[in-house]
Amino acid sequence: NRLVFGGTLAQPDTIWMSQIGKYFNFDVGDAEDTDSFDLTAATGQVNEIRYMVSNRDLQVFTGSGELYIPTYLNQAITPTNAQIRKQTPYGTEFILPASIDGATIFVQHDGHTVREYLYTESEDAYTASAVSTLSGHLIQHPRFMTVVHSGFDLADSYAFLVLESGEGALFSSNRAEKRASWTRVTTPGMFSSTIAVHNRLFTNVYDAAGNLHLCEFSEDVGLDLYLYKAVSTNTVDVSDLYNSGDVVDVIGIKDGKQSYLGEFTVTAGEEVDLSLYSESAFTHAYVGKAFTAKIVSNPIDVTSGNGPVTGDVRGISNVILDLKGARSFKINNRSFSPDNALTGKKEIRVLGHSRDPQV
């Protein structure tokens, strides 16, 4: 129960801890258990302290390595038992590390690698394994990172990184089931920053016109940067967000049911004309930008009775998709637009042969 500071210009590798329960008292006194104290990371080099995370222990992230101050069972950290131990040599970028699924993830100082700082019983030490090895091309100088736990009504935890390019990278982790994955996230415009509040994920987004918006990730509507408006005389006013000439997607609402109407061009009056659907009598509409979830499989490879078939001409005959509320999808340039949203498994037969067959 102490206030902890780490690193100054004069003493970049020093940590100061206040007296217990007295957050503004840093008097070292007589080195009693409740007194304040300071520690220097004497590891043979200057460790510029950048961040500290209170997790299983007090984890210390520096520009040249990862350290920690161990805690002891049923014992508080005191001036007589406190010590700093160096664990891994990678160094941390100027991005706040975050706890996720029992570990702490951080961006390595090169700006291209995300690592997982985790205590392992087998080594009796902390390790910092890379979790972005197969997706290193997605990690391009992150600027912000946040974690949402059990977000979107799912069991997994998610880390969202805002990249220098304005794109996003989403990391999902479920350690109990040994599942982890990376996904590139884009938007019309660019992501600026991000923050998680409980199980909700927010981000600042600059649209194509340079306007700043506070947005929330939600699965309610399959549109990006959308407006919910009433339909009046077969038109929808979108002047709050869109300009004349913008191409938008529209979902019509009637009796609580959603129907995807397609793409529309905003008129000179900054409205969307729904005259083609006047007979449907839609009362409200969602107007926004459609986004695409794209998955590209690795080349399918198997081992036959004669050995691996790598490099042989082979084909994929059928694909089974596990869908949730899908209103349209495309497989190998074949488009599908069911009358009603599909949820569940859907089998699609495909044609073609290749030495590296993919879907």
Task: Describe every region a protein language model picked out.
Residues I84:
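Catalytic-domain carbohydrate-binding cleft regions of carbohydrate-active enzymes
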Residues G44-N47, R56, L67, P79-N81, ...:
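Beta-sheet repeat architectures centered on beta-propellers
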Residues Q59-N74:
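Surface-exposed extracellular loop regions of Gram-negative outer-membrane beta-barrel proteins
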Residues N1-V53, D57, S64, Q108-S132, ...:
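N-terminal beta-propeller domains
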